[in-house]
């Protein structure tokens, strides 16, 4: 006899939070794919790296798709947030803490200790998990994999796989489906494939293109005006100059116009890879964000502080790149500083002239 007390007031059988057999199989497939990556991390020498890489990524995809199909296609259309507060991974439970620690550790190693992932700096072959991605990197760009290629691949896999899951969850809402398809497209095409194809162009002596995600707009693309980036564009002929001009136009024309018409959602929800990951892989965790007014105020202060910092640092970077001799440069350091001052003054004047009332209602702390 089961003596467990069920506090549900449902007259019918309460919702079961247990996994179905299909979901368990799907999780097993996904974990197997992750296990292959873990084996590579510990420098396992696979006999056929291409086979095991595709097997790993394929199992992760297949597991996510099968799980999503059983979770949503067996139910009526509508938002399903079943048991998010009862699952350990999505309710600050043990699995959630373990996942957070693992991801934080991965980012620390990725940025500061890539050699532990198998990256070599002496010209020798990669090892570890980075070597597992070498075949795919050679296929796309003709170069060995780096820690950033590994990260970009896993990032793209997460958006595509969980984007499919998100589209099933919101299959009753065409807007959400189109928006999700958009971020999946931009991540796969603009953030992942096109930069790799651009790197292959560098095999020609006529090109020295830097890494450039076309959809990444300043200040998100904070390195656009670094000297190595500008020199790479300018030394790559018409294509390089076109890409540099497109980057500048994106900042001063495309982004302001679309933001004025549609708000920041046109970028954060439809284009940006950061928002794309948050809306796909991060969807099961959105309820954990703080809803306090203080959290919202802190966010506003941080956002605008970072923006001011970005403007100052970018101005300093471009200033240091330019020359001083007006006979050698049409855009000198002094002309640039005057231009920045005039631009900021015009923006301030326009806002105060046409948006003073709206600013008075919104700019509160």
For each predicted feature, which ranges?
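Non-ligating segments of multi-cofactor redox enzymes
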Residues: 2-365
């Amino acid at each position: 006899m089961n003596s467990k007390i069920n506090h549900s007031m449902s007259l019918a059988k309460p919702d079961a939070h247990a996994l179905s057999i299909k979901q368990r199989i799907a999780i097993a497939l996904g974990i197997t794919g992750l296990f292959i990556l873990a084996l590579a991390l510990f420098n396992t020498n696979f006999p056929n790296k291409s086979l095991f890489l595709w097997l790993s990524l394929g199992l992760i995809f297949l597991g996510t798709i099968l799980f999503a199909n059983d979770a949503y296609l067996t139910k009526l259309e509508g938002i399903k947030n079943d048991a998010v507060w009862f699952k350990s991974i999505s309710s600050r439970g043990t699995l959630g803490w373990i996942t957070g620690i693992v991801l934080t550790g991965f980012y620390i190693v990725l940025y500061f200790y890539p050699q532990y992932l198998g990256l070599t700096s002496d010209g020798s072959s990669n090892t570890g998990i980075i070597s597992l991605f070498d075949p795919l990197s050679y296929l796309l760009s003709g170069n060995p994999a780096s820690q950033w290629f590994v990260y970009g691949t896993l990032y793209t896999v997460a958006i595509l796989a969980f984007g499919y899951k998100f589209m099933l969850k919101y299959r009753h809402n065409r807007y959400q489906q189109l928006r999700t398809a958009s971020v999946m497209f931009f991540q796969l095409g603009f953030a992942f494939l096109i930069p790799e194809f651009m790197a292959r162009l560098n095999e020609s002596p006529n090109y020295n293109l830097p890494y450039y995600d076309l959809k990444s707009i300043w200040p998100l693309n904070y390195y656009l005006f670094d000297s190595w980036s500008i020199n790479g564009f300018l030394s790559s002929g018409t294509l390089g100059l076109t890409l540099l001009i497109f980057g500048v136009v994106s900042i001063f024309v495309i982004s302001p116009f679309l933001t004025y018409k549609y708000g920041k959602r046109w970028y954060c929800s439809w284009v940006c890879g950061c928002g794309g990951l948050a809306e796909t892989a991060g969807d099961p965790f959105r309820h954990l964000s703080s809803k306090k007014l203080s959290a919202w105020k802190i966010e506003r202060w941080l956002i605008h502080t970072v923006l001011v910092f970005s403007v100052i640092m970018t101005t300093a970077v471009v200033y240091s790149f330019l020359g001083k001799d007006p006979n050698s440069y049409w855009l000198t350091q002094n002309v640039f500083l005057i231009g920045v001052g005039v631009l900021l003054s015009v923006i301030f004047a326009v806002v105060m002239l046409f948006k003073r009332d709206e600013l008075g209602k919104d700019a509160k702390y």
